[in-house]
Amino acid sequence: MAYVTWLLAILHVHKALCEETLWDTTVRLSETMTLECVYPLTHNLTQVEWTKNTGTKTVSIAVYNPNHNMHIESNYLHRVHFLNSTVGFRNMSLSFYNASEADIGIYSCLFHAFPNGPWEKKIKVVWSDSFEIAAPSDSYLSAEPGQDVTLTCQLPRTWPVQQVIWEKVQPHQVDILASCNLSQETRYTSKYLRQTRSNCSQGSMKSILIIPNAMAADSGLYRCRSEAITGKNKSFVIRLIITDGGTNKHFILPIVGGLVSLLLVILIIIIFILYNRKRRRQVRIPLKEPRDKQSKVATNCRSPTSPIQSTDDEKEDIYVNYPTFSRRPKPRL
């Protein structure tokens, strides 16, 4: 009995640690990075605070209360500012001046609301290149504004899937839209401002993400990550394109670019063929000139007025004219 209690305690601690290390958004480190934090509900907000988890301790960055002035810690006083601290302070996104590697870590944006209670968003800042480069598209989907868009991801069949995560990938950040633990059939509540829906049922062979009433801002890359308990994972990336009244520049541009590249290759091949033909002709002309000169020399040696005699002329009789002398009788003596 004591062993079972001890095992349950370990599992509880492990679950708590996993929940603590989970973050809602991953942001690429840059000098002027912005950590987005917008409260999505309409409850009465009383206070908001920003903190950073260094791994060993939690450091306070700023605290804002509508009944008091904004308080920013001395270490961050001239390094951060709030983009929108208007009345209601629902958008408390934190922007940095000249951020450096020292700012890498996990940040917490905590809203205190009444009567709903605390609402927290965790943001992880990492050193990385553009996230879109690391997530090339596997499929394309086009839709019109106002439609309910359904993204589908086929799950692996060769190994058991424990968790499925849907993310929206942007160049500067990656947001978790939905997360489902298939073994426990538990869902993750997304802190992303855009509300989405997804399925979460054990034994399902595919995962879907529904984006209601799609708009132009929903265009972009969506990644479906399947993870096993052993750490094995697989990703599937879909590029969603919300058309603007029927024309889609984002979809047309790659096609036009491909056609232009194809025409350019064809033009280069044609120029190469024509160049080779011209070069061959230039090589043949000097070879013909000696033959022409020989024929001209042979022609000049012949008399222009003497025609070529035929074989019949060679067989004709030849007559010679001899002079005739008169025979006078010798005088008789």
UniProtKB/Swiss-Prot annotation:
PROSITE patterns registered for this protein in UniProt: IG_LIKE
Any one cellular-component term (Gene Ontology): external side of plasma membrane
Superkingdom, natural source: Eukaryota
Key word Signal present: yes
Subcellular location: Cell membrane
Molecular function (Gene Ontology), one example: integrin binding
Sites where a glycan is attached: 44, 84, 91, 98, 181, 199, 233
Residue numbers carrying Phosphotyrosine: 319
Function: Cell surface receptor that plays an important role in the immune system, particularly in intercellular adhesion, lymphocyte signaling, cytotoxicity and lymphokine secretion mediated by cytotoxic T-cells and NK cells. Functions as a costimulatory receptor upon recognition of target cells, such as virus-infected or tumor cells. Upon binding to its ligands PVR/CD155 or NECTIN2/CD112 on target cells, promotes the cytotoxic activity of NK cells and CTLs, enhancing their ability to kill these cells.
Protein name (record): CD226 antigen
Native species: Mus musculus
